[in-house]
C-alpha cells in the first residue's frame, strides 16, 4: 500500500505500540478522513495483520456469538477465514466500521486482559446504538479522536 501523507495519528500509533501496557485502541472520527489508511500503513510494522470490516464483510458480525474472550473471537474469525494467522505478540487486529457491530466494544476488555494481540477499532461511531452494547470496556481501552487534515499536516505534505 502506498502511503504518502504523514498524519499526527502516525506518531501516536508508534508510541502506542511501544507501550508495554497498551490498551485496545478506538480511533474515532468523521468519515473519509484517513483512519483506515493510517491504520493499514501502521499495520506494516507487524508480522501479521487481521482486518475485519463489519460493513463490507457482514459475515463477521457473528464473531461474538460464542463469547467475548480472545479465544472465542479468534476461533469464530478463523472459521470464516482460515488463512488468517494469529501469532501472539506479532499480530494486529483491526475491527473497522465498529459502529456496525455494537458488541465489538465489549470484547476489548478481554483482549486487554489477555494481552497477546494488539487491537485497534475504527469507525465514525455515527448512529451507534449504545443500548445494544453489553459493555463499553471502560478502563480497558484507549480512545483517539482523529480529525481531518489540519494545517500543520498540510504543511508536512509540502
Where does each model-flagged region fall?
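Phosphate-binding site recognition
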Residues: 1-158
Amino acid at each position: 500500500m502506498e502511503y504518502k501523507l504523514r498524519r499526527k495519528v502516525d506518531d501516536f500509533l508508534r508510541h502506542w505500540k511501544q507501550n508495554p501496557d497498551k490498551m485496545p485502541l478506538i480511533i474515532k472520527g468523521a468519515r473519509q478522513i484517513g483512519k483506515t489508511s493510517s491504520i493499514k500503513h501502521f499495520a506494516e510494522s507487524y508480522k501479521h495483520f487481521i482486518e475485519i470490516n463489519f460493513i463490507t464483510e457482514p459475515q463477521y458480525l457473528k464473531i461474538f456469538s460464542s463469547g467475548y474472550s480472545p479465544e472465542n473471537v479468534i476461533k469464530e474469525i478463523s472459521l470464516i477465514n482460515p488463512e488468517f494467522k494469529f501469532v501472539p505478540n506479532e499480530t494486529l487486529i483491526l475491527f473497522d466500521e465498529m459502529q456496525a457491530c455494537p458488541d465489538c466494544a465489549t470484547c476489548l476488555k478481554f483482549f486487554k486482559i489477555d494481552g497477546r494481540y494488539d487491537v485497534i477499532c475504527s469507525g465514525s461511531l455515527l448512529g451507534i446504538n449504545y443500548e445494544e452494547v453489553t459493555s463499553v470496556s471502560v478502563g480497558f481501552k484507549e480512545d483517539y479522536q482523529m480529525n481531518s487534515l489540519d494545517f500543520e499536516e498540510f504543511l508536512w505534505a509540502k
